[in-house]
């Protein structure tokens, strides 16, 4: 059995969880999130905790119980603390500027790159070379960060490009004559 699913999800004060037939919704101080969980797993409330149990006779139910538990835990964390991903621009003339729900990037192309943020995701630029993406949905925050990074991934010789702030880019050695 999945060891992840054995641990219950703690429900902090101010968080409201609604369990439907095949979906769960979590509402907290930062907002609300919904997630489809299917019929392989049952969620039961046990005081101030939520327990994930695999359904008997359903294929992959034991495997999905750990996944659903992790998703619900991320939802609870998202509506209480939120998630953020930091990106850094490395390169001469590479700049970022947040304008409302848009992110303007100057990445050495002949044109500026404008990335539209989806609903529920906010972007900040503390400096011209730092980008902070925040939101309550962990998957969505990570997806937006990956899309922004994909505009100019770090190249292997000088390391120029958009990288995660905690990313280590291994540089290659140049060709010797």
Curated annotation (Swiss-Prot):
InterPro entries cross-referenced by the UniProt entry: Ribosomal_uL6-like, Ribosomal_uL6-like_a/b-dom_sf, Ribosomal_uL6_a/b-dom, Ribosomal_uL6_bac-type, Ribosomal_uL6_CS
CC per GO annotation: cytosolic large ribosomal subunit
HAMAP family, per database record: Ribosomal_uL6_B
The task this protein performs is described as: This protein binds to the 23S rRNA, and is important in its secondary structure. It is located near the subunit interface in the base of the L7/L12 stalk, and near the tRNA binding site of the peptidyltransferase center.
Check the record and name the NCBIfam families matching this protein.
Answer: L6_bact
- What is the protein named? Large ribosomal subunit protein uL6
Concerning its family, UniProt says: Belongs to the universal ribosomal protein uL6 family.
Q: Which SUPFAM superfamilies match?
A: Ribosomal protein L6
Q: Name one GO molecular function term.
A: rRNA binding
Query: Subunit structure of this entry?
Result: Part of the 50S ribosomal subunit.
- Name the Pfam families for this protein: Ribosomal_L6 (PF00347)
Question: What gene is this protein a product of?
Answer: rplF
Source species? Aromatoleum aromaticum (strain DSM 19018 / LMG 30748 / EbN1) (Azoarcus sp. (strain EbN1))
So which domain of life are we looking at?
Bacteria
Q: Name one GO biological process term.
A: cytoplasmic translation
Q: Which UniProt keywords apply?
A: Ribonucleoprotein, Ribosomal protein, RNA-binding, rRNA-binding
Return the PANTHER family for the record. Answer: 60S/50S RIBOSOMAL PROTEIN L6/L9, LARGE RIBOSOMAL SUBUNIT PROTEIN UL6M
